[in-house]
Structures are given as structure tokens and as C-alpha cells.
């Protein structure tokens, strides 16, 4: 066992056990019980799909690239198969929780369907499947690119999106 000592070094700590060791456990501290009940975010957000089963695209509302992406999807979705919600909105934060993500995490586009959620390149491919030709066919071929390569490209663009495309002063919201 090592022990950190002042000055940045380490010291070796030797521990000798008696010949007979009892396996008795003593509780030193217990975690407090949560004051609130655990929230089932799927149930809490089921109203989003009660009257409208279309998937919801969650996007960064202050990102110029993301807003351009939403406009592109809207222009190529003549049948209005996708709804839109900014990640920063209250509904967006709830849907992030439903997807098992941190409500403050705006690092990825998320496509929330009734029974599952998609992030990063999987979300982009799934969105492409919903919009007009030729994008579903393009998504079909892109799925053969290994996910780690697709996500690597996605993450590099996403982490530099403000620097490359800028940021807007206000969060853009779109009507569904």
C-alpha cells in the first residue's frame, strides 16, 4: 500500500495482520436515504409521445451548425416526420434524462423515439432515415462504416463547432 506524503512523494506503508483475523464488519457511516423518490423519466416524459408518436430531435439551440442542421432536416422532411426541441429547453432537459444522459450535456444531437434514443453518429443516421430521398439510402451505406470511426468524426466536429461555425446569442426554437 502506498501513502502520499507532503512534497509530492510516496512512502510505502507496511501492514501486518495478526495470525487470527476476525471477519467482523463494523459500519462506520451509512449513506443517507434520498429525500426524493427516484423519478422514472420514461414515465415522466411519456406525455411527449401520448398524442404524437413522431421522434424528437434534440439539438444545441445556440450552435450555428446545429441550427443549420435543423433547417436542413426541416427542408428535407416534407412529411414532417420529426419534431424538434432545443437541448437547453426544459423539455429538452427532461428528454435528455429520459435518454439516460446528463441534462446539462449538450455535446451531441439526440434523437428520442418512443422506445429508444440515439446519440452522435447513430442519431444522424437515424434522422437521415426519416427525411426525403436520397438520405435514407445514404444512411444505409454509411451504417457500414464502423461506429467508432463515425463517432470519432462526429466528436471532432462537435467539439469544435463553436470555433468553426460560431454561436448565436439566443437559443433558436422551431415549431413542430
Residue spans of the language-model regions?
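Short, charged low-complexity linear segments at domain edges
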Residues: 24-47
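Thiol/selenol-based redox catalytic cores and closely related redox-interacting motifs
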Residues: 90-176
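Local sequence-structure signature of Cys/Sec-based thiol-disulfide redox active-site neighborhoods
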Residues: 44-76
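N-terminal chloroplast transit peptides
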Residues: 1-23, 29
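Conserved helix-turn-beta segment immediately C-terminal to the redox Cys motif
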Residues: 74-85
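A structure-centric signal for secondary-structure junctions around beta-strands
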Residues: 53, 60, 81, 105-106
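Active-site-adjacent beta-strand anchor residues
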Residues: 59, 85-86, 143
